[in-house]
Amino acid sequence: MEEFRRSYSRLCRESGAEPQEAVLQQLHQLPRGRLDLATQSLTVETCRALGKLLPRETLCTELVLSDCMLSEEGATLLLRGLCANTVLRFLDLKGNNLRAAGAEALGKLLQQNKSIQSLTLEWNSLGTWDDAFATFCGGLAANGALQRLDLRNNQISHKGAEELALALKGNTTLQQLDLRWNNVGLLGGRALMNCLPSNRTLWRLDLAGNNIPGDVLRAVEQAMGHSQDRLTTFQENQARTHVLSKEVQHLREEKSKQFLDLMETIDKQREEMAKSSRASAARVGQLQEALNERHSIINALKAKLQMTEAALALSEQKAQDLGELLATAEQEQLSLSQRQAKELKLEQQEAAERESKLLRDLSAANEKNLLLQNQVDELERKFRCQQEQLFQTRQEMTSMSAELKMRAIQAEERLDMEKRRCRQSLEDSESLRIKEVEHMTRHLEESEKAMQERVQRLEAARLSLEEELSRVKAAALSERGQAEEELIKAKSQARLEEQQRLAHLEDKLRLLAQARDEAQGACLQQKQVVAEAQTRVSQLGLQVEGLRRRLEELQQELSLKDQERVAEVSRVRVELQEQNGRLQAELAAQEALREKAAALERQLKVMASDHREALLDRESENASLREKLRLREAEIARIRDEEAQRASFLQNAVLAYVQASPVRTLSPPK
């Protein structure tokens, strides 16, 4: 910082002015990285020197120039020098009465500077000239580094707020914006509210003391809450990403360590393989010696083979002797076959007896099948009775649906009457509100003109006394306090008038509350009617559920009967097939018996096909009944949904009527 002091002194002397002792003292006591010139009256030469030094300064990250009473020229020179600075992060220009030229210089600063993150402009007059403030907003829209902006007490009107809203739509870095104690008004508040969905980074917006309705403030607070949630989520994601990146880096290090360990193990395995190859070479030598021994053993075996061939000749002679013995055995086998033929005849007689027994079993199975058929007919009669009961239930449901539709039509007619009456009352209240708003705007415009005239007079006095500013600074501060007291008195007078108008509006609110209570009574009556209809629908649903359970029980009984019959038929068929197989294996010559068995099988197939067709018919009838039952359930669900939808429509209409009351829009800001 010593170099900075020497450069400042040199530039001031080159311009023909002495350096300010207060500035030199602050530079001498300066902490590292922070230049605090607050409450120091900086001359134009000092501002020019600082504007030339700050672009090359690499240590100063914070610059405090609050209440320095900067002139337009001095502020322009200083801000022009900051355009090329790349290290400054915090800039405080509070209480310097910056106007048109200062606003334009700030706009250029925001366009060119890429390092300033916090900018404090409290107690200035940037919003007095719309064109200059539009230039400032253009610079804000193009800036990509600023995160915090303080614009309190800058006389920003609704037009300035609209320009600021356009800038916020293009800005992607600003996170905090303070607009307290300006003249934003209803139009400016709405413009700022409408720009918030386009801005994804702003999470704090202060609008207190701007004559903005409460509903707009609540909407802005809600949008800021969403932005804070997004910011929290983004920070959490960044933290998680950081943690995950650390984990990935740790895993990579572990993988590299594992790779090195793997390479070491591979080298060890290679050494072991070399050792094993040497051992295998020695083993091959041993195997070669063993192979030579085997060759000698094979030669010995060849000698044994010759001896075995001689023994084979002897065995052939023994085979001839065994052939003679075989001839005698064949004769014995012939006698045995004769005895087996006699036994076969006896088995054929037994098979005939078995066939007669099977025929008797088949007749018994036919009788049992007839009994099952009778049971199926009785179940069909019960099913027809259930179908008639279902038809009667359907008729009752149609009558109930017609009655519900009539009641719904009556409720809709009543709702239309209530809507017309509410619409008329809303139109009357809206016309009264418009008149009151016009009166209030005229009053505010007159007061604003008076204040502007007073400010212009004060500005003329300040310009005339600017040369003697160092001597009369205390007097200027006292006048500023008096102006603040007068402003507070004007605000208190406006607050009293607002309270009187609020009492008048509360009377109207009571009248509207009475109308709302009447509408709520009608809504409760409609809800009771809907509840009665729902209870009747639930009763019908219980009846349908009972019929469904009864139908399921009948289906279960029918399926059990079918399973028993199928099991019996399959058992009989299996027994017949087993008997048939044994008869075919034992009595190949008895063709007549085979034909009878085939006839029996054909009869069984015919019976099975008839039974299968009957089952298919029953299944189709059951499917049609299930489809009818499903349609009936869908009709009941649709009726329930219609009734619930109508009730929700009525409730939404009442809520919309209550929320559309003009009292909420005219309530004073908190």
UniProtKB/Swiss-Prot annotation:
SMART domains: LRR_RI. It holds the Pfam family LRR_6. Residues 252-645 form a coiled coil. GO terms for cellular component: centrosome; ciliary basal body; cytosol; plasma membrane. The keyword Cell membrane does not apply. LRR repeats lie at residues 58-80, 87-107, 115-136, 145-166, 173-194, 201-212. The keyword Transmembrane helix does not apply. Phosphorylated by NEK2 during misosis, phosphorylation reduces centrosomal localization which subsequently leads to centrosome separation. This is Leucine-rich repeat-containing protein 45. PANTHER family: LEUCINE-RICH REPEAT-CONTAINING PROTEIN 45, NY-REN-58 ANTIGEN. Homomer. Interacts with CROCC/rootletin and CEP250. Interacts with CEP44. Interacts with CCDC102B (via N-terminus). Keywords: Coiled coil, Cytoplasm, Cytoskeleton, Leucine-rich repeat, Phosphoprotein, Repeat. Component of the proteinaceous fiber-like linker between two centrioles, required for centrosome cohesion. The modification Phosphoserine is found at residue 661. It is found in: Cytoplasm, Cytoskeleton, Microtubule organizing center, Centrosome.
